[in-house]
């Protein structure tokens, strides 16, 4: 079997013996960031010491990679947790900022159209059907890009993300599936440019894409395609393993045998095992109460960009009703979707249920948790009943996605008010206040920047 080639940066290559002399693998210690709000360690190559320096300590940092670059002071301009300017970047990337008068743009950002879609033939190892990695694969097949900057699994831990440059279409197969954790994706921008890549595609989460767009004009690439995935909450790989252990303990399973996990839009978490078993757990049955208070770092609890509004195309699942959910945002996004041709089956997205009640209940729980009070937990006997009802009467399709965006907005206001009130006027965009206003959250003195 011939292993697909991934183009790892020169400082991250490792030769693997005579029969694999041309196979490029990550180093034994790929990228191992520590939890946000702590110091991120340097990259290492075995026997040669640090190659890229450690990220400097910052209170709110997801280690997107810019602080590991040769000009780390660019973080002041690039970081969405310092002084983001979404209207300006939306206008630069899409030709206009979001228009609250257009359907769903207040929630999802600028977009030309929203779709529910799936590949006709799902790709092996993909998280859903494989639209994201297939688009990137097509970019390489057609020669539209020289390389794709994305994440692959650590060879020693399938859940740990490792930043990679992929230069061969077949290499994208190794990048399918979900990772959980932090990896400095954008630290590879300078190596990509140094290797002569002029046309680049990037697959990233919102905090990475914001920094990429903020610096795009000075990066030196002739063409840049950005495929975004939504991101609701992230945590460290180590914390994620703790979560897997809690899930596995309920059925006396080995957490190391869990090969797949997904939070589905039908209010269930799906797990798959190495032996082929599939297990679906209702959200209400998850052992969330056993997680430590810092399981989700403050960066994720105060993020204002769930839908990745600065990508050319966003590929997620929240509005997909069991399929994938696409937001085609601009002309380049249309070009990316067109690469799939008749490989993809598109549908109009649906919407059902009401979101106000669930979001209001979520707000009450977030306020109690932020104040250190115990959550009001549902009686155990009632959980199976409500778990059965939620997929049938709760928000579904686009209404489910709207609810999740509003929950993230609510979470941002509540936690930032408590943990970083001095940041409110610079970190919270105007559209977030519009999202939370129906739930009684309005800015007080000093929480909103004066009009420009």
Where are these regions (language model features)?
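Long, compositionally biased charged/polar accessory segments in the mid-to-C-terminal portions
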Residues: 145-146, 248, 253-452
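Tryptophan (W) side chains
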Residues: 8-11
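Low-complexity, highly charged intrinsically disordered N-terminal segments
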Residues: 126-154
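Entry/capping segment at the start of metal-dependent catalytic domains
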Residues: 81-132
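Iron-sulfur cluster-binding cysteine motifs and their immediate structural context
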Residues: 29-97, 313
């Amino acid at each position: 079997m011939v292993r697909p080639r991934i183009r790892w940066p020169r400082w991250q290559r490792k030769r693997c013996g005579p029969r694999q002399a041309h196979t490029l693998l990550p180093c034994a210690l790929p990228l191992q960031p520590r939890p946000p709000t702590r110091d991120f360690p340097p990259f290492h190559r075995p026997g040669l010491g640090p190659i890229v320096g450690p990220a400097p300590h910052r209170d709110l940092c997801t280690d997107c990679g810019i602080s590991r670059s040769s000009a780390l002071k660019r973080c002041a301009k690039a970081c969405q947790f310092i002084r983001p300017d979404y209207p300006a970047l939306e206008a630069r990337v899409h030709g206009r900022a979001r228009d609250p008068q257009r359907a769903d743009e207040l929630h999802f950002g600028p977009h030309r159209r929203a779709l529910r879609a799936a590949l006709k033939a799902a790709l092996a190892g993909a998280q859903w059907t494989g639209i994201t990695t297939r688009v990137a694969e097509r970019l390489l097949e057609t020669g539209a890009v020289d390389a794709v900057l994305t994440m692959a699994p650590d060879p020693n831990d399938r859940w740990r993300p490792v930043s990679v440059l992929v230069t061969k279409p077949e290499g994208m197969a190794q990048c399918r599936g979900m990772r959980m954790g932090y990896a400095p994706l954008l630290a590879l921008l300078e190596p990509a440019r140094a290797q002569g890549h002029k046309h680049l595609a990037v697959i990233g989460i919102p905090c990475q894409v914001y920094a990429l767009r903020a610096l795009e004009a000075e990066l030196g690439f002739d063409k840049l395609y950005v495929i975004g995935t939504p991101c609701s909450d992230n945590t460290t790989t180590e914390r994620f393993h703790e979560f897997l252990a809690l899930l596995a303990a309920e059925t006396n399973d080995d957490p190391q045998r869990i090969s797949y996990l997904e939070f589905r839009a039908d209010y269930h978490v799906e797990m798959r095992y190495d032996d082929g078993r599939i297990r679906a757990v209702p959200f209400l049955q998850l052992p969330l109460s056993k997680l430590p208070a810092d399981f989700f770092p403050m960066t994720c609890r105060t993020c204002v960009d769930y839908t990745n509004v600065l990508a050319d195309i966003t590929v997620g699942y929240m509005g997909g009703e069991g399929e994938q959910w696409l937001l085609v945002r601009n002309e380049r996004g249309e070009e990316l979707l067109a690469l799939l041709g008749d490989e993809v089956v598109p549908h109009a997205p649906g919407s059902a249920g009401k979101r106000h009640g669930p979001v209001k209940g979520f707000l009450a729980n977030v306020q109690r948790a932020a104040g250190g009070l115990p959550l009001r937990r549902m009686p155990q006997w009632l959980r199976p009943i409500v778990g059965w009802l939620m997929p049938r009467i709760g928000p579904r399709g686009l209404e489910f996605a709207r609810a999740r965006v509003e929950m993230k907005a609510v979470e941002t206001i509540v936690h930032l008010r408590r943990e970083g009130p001095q940041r409110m006027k610079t970190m919270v965009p105007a559209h977030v206040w519009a999202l939370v206003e129906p739930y009684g959250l309005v800015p007080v003195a000093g929480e909103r920047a004066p009009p420009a």
